[in-house]
Every structure is written in structure tokens, then in C-alpha cells.
Design a protein with these regions (language model features):
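Short C-terminal tail/terminal secondary-structure segment
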Residues: 94-97, 227-228, 239-254
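Alpha-helical segment proximal to the catalytic Tyr-Lys
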Residues: 128, 147, 173-174, 236
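Conserved glycine-rich cofactor-binding loop
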Residues: 8, 15-17
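Substrate-binding pocket helix/loop in short-chain dehydrogenase/reductase
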Residues: 98-100, 107-112, 208
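Short, small/polar-rich loop/turn modules that mediate ligand/substrate recognition or access, typified
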Residues: 176, 181, 238-240
């Protein structure tokens, strides 16, 4: 229960799903946590849950596509807790789904702006704060979709998340000499509210579960434990990794 004692973390997309469970897990391991998402009332409930469990958290609502918001999150971490050690850039959007030739420019840009530009803006301001600390851990959420398995109808989502992997690897090469590790998690199907768009019928749910060697989807808590590994000193020699936490979807062919 003390893997992150004395550390301060930012978690975006924290109002639900993987981000919510990661924020609670980080706090339970001793971190001070800045929780970020668009819905203040959801963040307030998360902070209350963390504090009930004896942890420390502060909420700041906003949009990760807003550069001023990205800067404000880091400023809050430094002014309140004295610095920034960990950032989990997890906020995401499906974007418009369907045949690529039917996808609107607006639907395409939504996925790119949230998933890729949001990750870039977060990192842009998190990096100097970690440099001031003498090191840190940057973590991004990507996906197996388009990386190991192509899925029809997911062009905007897959392309934006593939871009996150490129960003992660570039940053890992740039920042390794400064003691900043940069990695990404690639979850398989996970039972979150965002993922319900993929499994809105029993038939779709059965199909998605069947893609996995384990024949089920992950819980958000299972993915959060992998994020904790990358955030902690347990992964002190890991950087530039696209870490599959996918229940075997990338190797299953039945």
C-alpha cells in the first residue's frame, strides 16, 4: 500500500472507467492525485471516495483539448503538492464510428483532438515539471485496435491511438537521459461506459468477448493495476513500451 508514497500524479479522464480506478489506486498507494475530466460533479464524487479511504486528491474540471487547462493542471500539482512525478494521459473519445468513407471531418477531428492532441498538450506541460523533479513517469492510453488487430469502422479512433504510440516512443527517446520514463498501455476490451458503444447488443458483446483468448473483457481495475506498475519504481527499467494488457486479443485467432 505504499508504492507511490511521496509522489504526485495527474490522471486525466478520471471521471469514469480506467481513469477513475487508476486515480483511486494511485491514492491508495500513497500518491497525491490531481483528477481531471470534463464533469466537475463526477470528479467531486471521486475526490470524496478517495478522501473517505484516507487518500489525498484535488479535482480540476476542463477539456484536455484546451492548452490553458493542460497548463493549469501542472500548476495545481506544483502549487499544492510541490511538484509532479507521474502523469497518466488517459482521456479519450471514440470519435465517429462507421465505414471510413462515411466519417465526417468533424467526427475524425474529435478523435484526433481528444486522443492525440490532448495527450500532446498534457505532455508538453508535464515534461518541464518532471524535469524540475529530476525524473518521472509519463503514461498514455492507446489501444490494440489498429495496432495488432484491424477493426472495421474504427478509422478515427484507431488512427488517433496509433499516433499516441508514435508520440510515446519519441518522448521516450528524448527524455530517457533525463530520467523520465514514457510508456503506453494498450488495453483490450474493457467494461467501461465509453466502450458500450462497441457492444450495444448482446451479439456485439459476444463477438468482442470472443476476440480475446480469455473470452471476456477486462475490468477497469485490472487495467489500473498495469498503470500502477508503469507509474511505480517496479518498472524502473521500462521506457518506450507499448504494453499490451489485452486478454490475448492480439494473439487469439479463434
Amino acid at each position: 500500500m505504499n508504492m507511490l508514497i511521496g509522489k504526485t500524479a495527474i490522471v486525466t479522464g478520471a471521471s469514469s472507467g480506467i481513469g477513475y480506478e487508476t486515480a483511486r489506486l494511485f491514492a491508495g498507494e500513497g500518491a497525491n492525485v490531481i483528477v481531471a475530466a470534463r464533469r466537475q460533479h463526477e470528479l467531486d464524487k471521486l475526490v470524496a471516495a478517495i478522501e473517505w479511504d484516507g487518500g489525498k486528491a484535488i479535482a480540476l474540471a476542463g477539456d484536455v483539448r484546451d492548452e490553458a487547462y493542460a497548463k493549469s493542471l501542472v500548476k495545481l500539482a506544483e502549487s499544492t503538492f510541490g511538484g509532479l512525478d507521474i502523469a497518466f494521459n488517459n482521456a479519450g473519445a471514440n470519435g465517429e464510428m462507421g465505414p471510413t468513407s462515411d466519417v465526417s471531418l468533424e467526427g475524425w477531428q474529435e478523435a484526433l483532438n481528444v486522443n492525440l492532441t490532448g495527450a500532446f498538450l498534457g505532455a508538453k506541460y508535464q515534461i518541464p515539471a518532471m524535469q524540475r523533479r529530476g525524473g518521472g513517469s509519463l503514461i498514455f492510453t492507446s489501444t490494440f485496435v489498429g495496432y495488432t488487430v484491424g477493426m472495421p469502422g474504427t478509422a478515427a479512433y484507431a488512427a488517433s491511438k496509433a499516433g499516441v504510440i508514435g508520440l510515446m516512443k519519441t518522448l521516450a527517446a528524448e527524455l530517457g537521459p533525463q530520467g523520465i520514463r514514457v510508456n503506453a498501455i494498450l488495453p483490450g476490451g474493457t467494461a467501461t461506459s465509453m466502450a458500450e458503444a462497441w457492444v450495444d447488443t448482446p451479439e456485439k458483446l459476444a463477438f468482442v468477448e470472443g476476440l480475446h483468448a480469455l473470452k471476456r473483457r477486462a475490468t477497469p481495475e485490472e487495467i489500473a493495476r498495469s498503470v500502477l506498475y508503469l507509474a511505480s519504481d517496479a518498472s524502473s527499467f521500462s521506457t518506450g513500451s507499448a504494453m499490451l494488457v489485452d486478454g490475448g486479443v492480439s494473439i487469439n485467432r479463434t
